[in-house]
């Protein structure tokens, strides 16, 4: 797994305690099977967040970890979690909650891959399948780690289909989304927490962490170690950011077609703010003979899985989506993100454009601005302390 190590090492963190920084995975005193899994997965040395947070998680402390997209946050809590669980016990010991099914499934794969030489039993519980299917697989194979969405996990717990007595660690990934009021996850998280042993460790992870979210964590965390990237470090170095003035909403489509015709794209994600707009744009592009796929939260799970697989394997190069795809989904070859609509939530800007330039690769983000978007763009620039440039007339300069 290739990081932009030069930039990664320059990141400035603020932490609640003086932290030991581990320069190598060997210095973390990890299980031999876990170490083999880490190197087999492609990691060579810990990223900045990994070098600070993994040993804190292993020590059993509650941890709040915040870092940019593409810096190895998922592996951070996964490595800590796999080191902590007792492989001799077949009970559920670790629970990871995420806001989307796709992210929960992806985390499940990371757990399986990193734990490949440990024979760890992990399962992704994401809805879209029957509870009977979930139960059958858990009973057949056993389960030490579950990665799931809050609704499905809570339902399984309430029906006593999964046992939480032995859960040692609860991880909230993309915690700002899980603990906000917008999607209704917060009360589900509280309910799940009350069903766990009082001694359970809590790890909270996200690319953005507002003061409001940090305040909420006090309700269920015990003197957590905070490892936070300083605000001016969140701007995703390595991603060129541009805007193009389109004046009117109806002119966006022609602008998109011009860009599509002019660039050689490895893979691209186009973000819209509504499911209706995603469907409309996908239909319009297909009518114009552009090959695209699309995904949003109203689609059936098997259809979403098919789309994700097509995009992840490179069968499709252009994906149109709502913010359901902005959170943590890792496809290495994405080189371009287009905000057809500027995000309505400021924090989602970094989640969206972080889909390009993964692990230090170069990426490009293009923002379409109508007249009414100009002030919104200024808000985003002010929040992240960045200056987004106008798109050059010669599009070859983008690469």
UniProtKB/Swiss-Prot annotation:
EC number: 3.6.4.13
PROSITE patterns with a match to the protein in the record: DEAD_ATP_HELICASE, HELICASE_ATP_BIND_1, HELICASE_CTER, Q_MOTIF
UniProt xrefs under Pfam families: DEAD, Helicase_C
Origin: domain of life: Eukaryota
GO biological process, one term: maturation of SSU-rRNA from tricistronic rRNA transcript (SSU-rRNA, 5.8S rRNA, LSU-rRNA)
Binding site for ATP: 67-74
GO molecular function: ATP binding; ATP hydrolysis activity; RNA binding; RNA helicase activity
Compartment(s) where it occurs, according to its Swiss-Prot or TrEMBL record: Nucleus, Nucleolus
Catalysis: reaction(s): ATP + H2O = ADP + phosphate + H(+)
Residue span, Helicase C-terminal domain: 238-399
Enzyme class (EC, first level): hydrolase
Domain Helicase ATP-binding: 54-227
Matches recorded under Gene3D superfamilies: P-loop containing nucleotide triphosphate hydrolases
Positions of short motif DEAD box: 173-176
Main location: nucleus
Listed transmembrane segments: none
Alphabetized SUPFAM superfamilies for the sequence: P-loop containing nucleoside triphosphate hydrolases
Keywords: ATP-binding, Helicase, Hydrolase, Nucleotide-binding, Nucleus, Ribosome biogenesis, RNA-binding, rRNA processing
One GO CC annotation: nucleolus
Record motif Q motif, residues: 23-51
Family (UniProt): Belongs to the DEAD box helicase family. DDX48/FAL1 subfamily.
Written domain comment of the UniProt record: The Q motif is unique to and characteristic of the DEAD box family of RNA helicases and controls ATP binding and hydrolysis.
Function: ATP-dependent RNA helicase involved in 40S ribosomal subunit biogenesis. Required for the processing and cleavage of 35S pre-rRNA at sites A0, A1, and A2, leading to mature 18S rRNA.
Protein name from the UniProt record: ATP-dependent RNA helicase FAL1
Organism for this UniProt entry: Candida glabrata (strain ATCC 2001 / BCRC 20586 / JCM 3761 / NBRC 0622 / NRRL Y-65 / CBS 138)
Gene name, Swiss-Prot/TrEMBL: FAL1
């Amino acid at each position: 797994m290739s990081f932009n190590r030069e930039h990664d090492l320059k990141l400035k963190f603020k932490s609640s305690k003086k932290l030991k920084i581990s320069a190598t995975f060997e210095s973390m005193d990890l299980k031999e099977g876990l170490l083999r899994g880490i190197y087999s997965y492609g990691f060579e040395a810990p990223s900045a967040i990994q070098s600070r947070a993994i040993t804190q998680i292993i020590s059993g402390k509650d941890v709040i970890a915040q870092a940019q997209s593409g810096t190895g946050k998922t592996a951070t809590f996964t490595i800590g979690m796999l080191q902590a669980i007792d492989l001799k016990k077949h009970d559920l010991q670790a629970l990871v909650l995420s806001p989307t099914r796709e992210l929960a499934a992806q985390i499940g794969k990371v757990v399986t891959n990193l734990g490949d030489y440990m024979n760890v039993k992990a399962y992704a519980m994401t809805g879209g399948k029957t509870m009977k299917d979930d139960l059958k697989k858990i009973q057949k194979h056993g389960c030490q780690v579950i990665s799931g969405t809050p609704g499905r996990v809570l339902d399984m717990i309430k029906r006593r289909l999964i046992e939480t007595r032995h859960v040692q660690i609860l991880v909230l990934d993309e915690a700002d989304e899980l603990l906000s009021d917008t999607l209704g996850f917060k009360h589900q998280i509280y309910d799940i927490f009350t069903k766990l042993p009082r001694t359970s460790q809590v790890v909270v992870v996200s690319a953005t962490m507002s003061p409001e979210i940090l305040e909420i964590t006090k309700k269920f965390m015990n003197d957590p170690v905070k490892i936070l990237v300083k605000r001016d470090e969140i701007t995703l170095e390595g991603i060129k950011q541009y805007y193009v003035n389109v004046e009117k909403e109806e002119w966006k489509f022609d602008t998109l077609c011009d860009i599509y015709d002019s660039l050689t794209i490895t893979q691209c994600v186009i973000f819209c703010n509504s499911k209706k707009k995603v469907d409309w744009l996908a239909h319009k592009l297909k009518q114009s003979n552009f090959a695209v796929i699309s995904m949003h939260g109203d689609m059936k799970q098997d259809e979403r899985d098919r789309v994700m697989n097509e995009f992840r394997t490179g069968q499709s190069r252009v994906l149109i989506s709502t913010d359901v795809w902005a959170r943590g989904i890792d496809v290495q070859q994405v080189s371009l993100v287009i905000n057809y609509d500027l995000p309505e939530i400021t924090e989602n800007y970094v989640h969206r454009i972080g889909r390009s330039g993964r692990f230090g690769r170069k990426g490009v983000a293009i923002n379409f601005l109508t007249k009414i978007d100009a002030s919104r763009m200024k808000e985003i620039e002010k929040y992240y302390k960045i200056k987004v440039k106008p798109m050059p007339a010669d599009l070859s300069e983008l690469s």
